């Protein structure tokens, strides 16, 4: 991240609303709006994802791979949300945290970013196998299998973030890419992963829908709905931002030189970036509206909390039987 006062900045997240005096008011509004939004998203994500983690650990079985994937998505969103207050500070004071934290925080940011898309992709592949070829996922995965899959995704995320870690440094513009080449490479890499995962997920859901239309099992229909909602929310949030980042590379490489178009892109990048960064608080909302089991568990948790405050006996616990769900269903159906 960076202080936005330098129009030559090459950082991944840069947009320049301050390059012209007439844009001063727009910049002040953008700074205020982003500060308020990030603080709100941080609080919502912290509360929402913490509740999801509590429900998963207390009421659900972690022998299910789908539960493991959702748990890791929550962790990834929590890490992402905890970085939002850090990204506010450059708007007001520039980068004041030094070179080491510049590299470290951008590495953590990238790991969180890539882990989300990798877990969504592998969760969709797992759902595809469960629906299209249910016998292949009927057996409960061993602890070793669950650990290996989780570790593989996090290791892949760390390796994917190496570029952002090495080539970020503190410059006059703030915490920034050291050269335009590395900025372009990073954008293209992220766009590539985004498009590959989108292609894989689209293929899986086409096959899933074809199978479900031939099946009369309402259970199987329910097992797809929440994951589909999570995936759609992710791509609707991050898709516009990835597209505007790609358009920005056309200006940086001077393929497009229109000043008016560039200014419009800066506004679009501001809006799309704030939408994308708000995604970390969306999943708990989806669990409430789409996940029947999560709603039930959440009501029970809130009732317990309320009865605790009134110093009255809490209602009877919801029965919960450990073990994998049929067809390795998602937690919150």
UniProtKB/Swiss-Prot annotation:
Disulfide bonds join 102-175. GO terms for cellular component: external side of plasma membrane; plasma membrane. Its main location: membrane. One of its GO terms (biological process) is G protein-coupled receptor signaling pathway. It is found in: Cell membrane. InterPro entries: CCR1-9-like, Chemokine_XCR1, GPCR_Rhodpsn, GPCR_Rhodpsn_7TM. Residues 1-31, 90-103, 168-190, 251-267 are extracellular. Residues 60-69, 126-142, 210-225, 292-333 are cytoplasmic. PROSITE patterns: G_PROTEIN_RECEP_F1_1 (PS00237), G_PROTEIN_RECEP_F1_2 (PS50262). It is a multi-pass membrane protein. GO terms for molecular function: C-C chemokine binding; C-C chemokine receptor activity; chemokine receptor activity. Pfam families: 7tm_1. The chain crosses the membrane at residues 32-59, 70-89, 104-125, 143-167, 191-209, 226-250, 268-291. Keywords: Cell membrane, Disulfide bond, G-protein coupled receptor, Membrane, Receptor, Transducer, Transmembrane, Transmembrane helix. Receptor for chemokines SCYC1 and SCYC2. Subsequently transduces a signal by increasing the intracellular calcium ions level. Receptor for XCL1/Lymphotactin. Belongs to the G-protein coupled receptor 1 family. This is Chemokine XC receptor 1. It comes from Homo sapiens.
